[in-house]
């Protein structure tokens, strides 16, 4: 998306000579026959003593290619590159000069520049034409003695003003087309690029040639196309913003759908999601997928990263200080902002071959943003992947994505997908379960630890707890509350029993003492595993929401669950990836409706 930049215009009339004027003077052709054909003697004096005709004709020749060496910042009124405002003094006058000065005070040339000595200008122009191998055309009045230069310049200005009004010059004929395409006040920048000379330089075109004009016209066309694309992209983003307001749902639908998605992931049946929520059929865009987006099924508008690339450095610096969404901008990023690299920054060193266990990877994790649009939002699947990457010890970036703002760059990055998803060395990964498997296979020892469980039972422990919680928290009937609470307690008791049961490696066959209660910290031992990354975020949500909206707490006799949670709260990999309690409570503020 092309950004509107500050146009570098120039003041009209900064050219020493009017454009395209071919003034020969009335009654002067007869002077061509004076003194016979003594062109050789007069040719040496022509650069200094040329009259208004040669001066004007040389200026007309210079219109095509004097952009780079002139002190006025590129093409002037003669050139279509500067837009419609840069016209001759006769056509635009003082208002055009004032407007150009306001837009680019440094690029504006004082009116006094028009009074530059004509002899010096003609000399530079003539030499430029000769350098192209073209014989300069010398009108008849060039062989007569120069008249009053003030009167000559006045005549030239008057005639050039008539030509400007009549549209005689080629540059002025193109200007209305440029204005129509680019829109009001959308003049292109100096097409030659870079500094184009100082104001003190003479306006002679020593290196003038028609080629720069062709290049300039091509640049104008390209930039105009960019402006049109930017306008279309802006309109698309505006339509998408209005569409987002229509499709946006409240926190209750988000939490309810999220619970159902968690249950569906646990049971491996996406059909169950529709049965539990009863809201999927009403969604306008069912093709959008993502376990954490809840009922806010919004498709990001069309767009690209190009619009943000110009501001990527600024956005990366700001993102180090706060959590914010990507994806913009400019990438800002409009869609989200990076939280910064986790586990430090990549060290400079020799490039490693692909497949080397020590190879650094370019990893970015996109997680759901909170209701403020910046902080980490309530999403157990986002936290699951966050924990896995942290435990692996790999360097990665985290970007929060605000679904309500519908970042345009996500449409190109992961069309139809809501967070969490990941980019790994430029490859987009969207399925949470497959991402977990991929990371376990790709990030292997000795550089990265193995996170798989040693006991298969640990993977299924507590897999029905969140489903029972969802039914319990969404129930609004008091007479049914006891039933749902008992179902939840039954699932929790099953989990507590597994946590208190000693694992085989905890039992010492040679010991005379029997171990009856496990003292391990986590599901599969004293280290966090993939099973913990899956269960702990859900268990934490149950603890916060049940207490807030149902005044329900895990029974104190469930020592296994309390030991499990307390050990998790002592680990940075868990606490630093958890959303704030207020984020979790806000997500369920309407889903946990009051019982009647």
From Swiss-Prot:
Q: Identify the taxonomic lineage of the organism of origin.
A: Eukaryota, Metazoa, Chordata, Craniata, Vertebrata
Q: Where is the composition biased (Gly residues)?
A: 65-74
List the residue ranges of the region (Disordered): 1-360
Q: Which GO terms describe its cellular component?
A: chloride channel complex; cytoplasm; plasma membrane
Q: Which reaction does it catalyse?
A: chloride(in) = chloride(out)
Q: What does this protein do?
A: In the soluble state, catalyzes glutaredoxin-like thiol disulfide exchange reactions with reduced glutathione as electron donor. Can insert into membranes and form voltage-dependent chloride-selective channels. The channel opens upon membrane depolarization at positive voltages and closes at negative membrane voltages. May play a critical role in water-secreting cells, possibly through the regulation of chloride ion transport.
The short sequence motif called G-site sits at 379-382
Q: What is this protein called?
A: Chloride intracellular channel protein 6
Give me the stretches of Acidic residues compositional bias.
148-160
Q: Which gene encodes it?
A: Clic6
Q: Which domain of life is it from?
A: Eukaryota
Q: What class of enzyme is it?
A: oxidoreductase
Q: Which residues cross the membrane?
A: 381-401
What does the PTM comment state?
A: Phosphorylated.
Q: Output the Pfam families linked to this UniProt entry.
A: CLIC-like_N
Modification type Phosphoserine: residues: 40, 304
The annotated modulation of its activity is:
Channel activity is redox- and pH-regulated. Inhibited by IAA-94.
Amino acid composition bias (Low complexity), ranges on this chain: 83-98, 197-213, 225-244
Q: How does this polypeptide assemble, per the annotation?
A: Monomer (soluble state). Interacts with dopamine receptors DRD2, DRD3 and DRD4.
E.C. number: 1.8.-.-
What subcellular locations does the record give? Cytoplasm; Cell membrane
Establish whether keyword Transit peptide is in the entry. Answer: no
Q: Which InterPro entries match?
A: CLIC, CLIC_N, Glutathione-S-Trfase_C-like, Glutathione-S-Trfase_C_sf, Glutathione_S-Trfase, Thioredoxin-like_sf
Q: What is known of its domains?
A: The active G-site contains a monothiol Cys-X-X-Ser motif which mediates glutathione-dependent redox catalysis.
**Record-annotated GST C-terminal domain positions:** 425-596
Indicate the family of this protein: Belongs to the chloride channel CLIC family.
């Amino acid at each position: 998306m092309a950004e509107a930049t500050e146009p570098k215009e120039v003041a009209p009339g900064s050219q020493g000579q009017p454009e395209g004027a071919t003034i020969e003077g009335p009654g002067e052709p007869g002077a061509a026959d004076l003194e016979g054909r003594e062109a050789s003697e007069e040719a040496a004096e022509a650069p200094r003593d040329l009259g208004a005709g040669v001066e004007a004709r040389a200026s007309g020749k210079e219109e095509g290619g004097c952009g780079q060496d002139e002190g006025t910042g590129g093409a002037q009124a003669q050139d279509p590159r500067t837009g419609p405002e840069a016209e001759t003094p006769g056509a635009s006058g003082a208002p055009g000069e004032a407007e150009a000065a306001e837009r680019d005070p440094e690029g504006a040339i004082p009116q006094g520049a028009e009074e530059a000595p004509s002899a010096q200008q003609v000399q530079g122009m003539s030499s430029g034409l000769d350098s192209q191998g073209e014989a300069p055309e010398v009108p008849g009045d060039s062989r007569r003695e120069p008249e009053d230069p003030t009167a000559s310049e006045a005549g030239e200005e008057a005639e050039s003003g008539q030509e400007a009004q009549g549209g005689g010059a080629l540059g002025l004929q193109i200007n209305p087309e440029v204005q129509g395409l680019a829109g009001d006040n959308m003049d292109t920048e100096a097409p030659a690029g870079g500094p184009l000379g100082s104001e003190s330089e003479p306006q002679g075109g020593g290196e003038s040639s028609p080629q720069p004009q062709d290049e300039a016209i091509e640049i104008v066309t390209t930039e105009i196309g960019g402006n049109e694309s930017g306008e279309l992209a802006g309109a698309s983003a505006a339509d998408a913003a209005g569409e987002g307001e229509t499709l946006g749902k409240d926190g209750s639908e988000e939490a309810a759908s999220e619970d159902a998605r968690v249950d569906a992931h646990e049971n491996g049946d996406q059909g169950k999601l529709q049965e539990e929520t009863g809201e999927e059929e009403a969604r306008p865009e069912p093709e959008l997928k993502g376990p954490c987006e809840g009922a806010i099924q919004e498709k990001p508008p069309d767009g690209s990263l190009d619009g943000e690339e110009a501001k990527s450095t600024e956005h990366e610096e700001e993102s180090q200080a706060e959590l914010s969404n990507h994806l913009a901008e400019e990438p800002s990023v409009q869609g989200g902002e990076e939280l910064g690299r986790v586990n430090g920054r990549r060290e400079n060193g020799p490039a490693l071959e692909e497949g080397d266990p020590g190879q650094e990877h370019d990893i970015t994790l996109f997680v759901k943003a909170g209701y403020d649009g910046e902080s980490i939002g309530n999403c157990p699947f986002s936290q699951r992947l966050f924990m896995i990457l942290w435990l692996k010890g790999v360097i990665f970036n985290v970007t929060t994505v605000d679904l309500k703002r519908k970042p345009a760059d996500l449409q190109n990055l992961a069309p139809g997908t809501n967070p969490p998803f990941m980019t790994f060395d430029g490859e987009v990964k969207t399925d949470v379960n497959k991402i977990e498997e991929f990371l376990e296979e790709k990030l292997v020892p000795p550089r990265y630890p193995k996170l798989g469980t040693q006991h298969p039972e640990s993977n299924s422990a507590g897999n029905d707890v969140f489903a029972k919680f969802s039914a319990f928290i969404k129930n609004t009937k008091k007479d049914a509350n006891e039933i749902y609470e008992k179902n939840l307690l039954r699932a929790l008791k099953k989990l507590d029993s597994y946590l208190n049961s000693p694992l085989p490696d905890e039992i010492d066959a040679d010991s005379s003492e029997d171990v009856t209660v496990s003292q391990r910290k986590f599901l599969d031992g004293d280290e966090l595993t993939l099973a913990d990354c899956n269960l702990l975020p859900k268990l934490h949500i149950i603890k916060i929401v049940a207490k807030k909206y149902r005044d329900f707490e895990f029974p104190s006799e469930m020592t296994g669950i309390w030991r499990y949670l307390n050990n998790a709260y002592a680990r940075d990999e868990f606490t630093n990836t958890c959303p704030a309690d207020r984020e979790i409570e806000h997500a369920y503020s309407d889903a946990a409706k009051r019982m009647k």
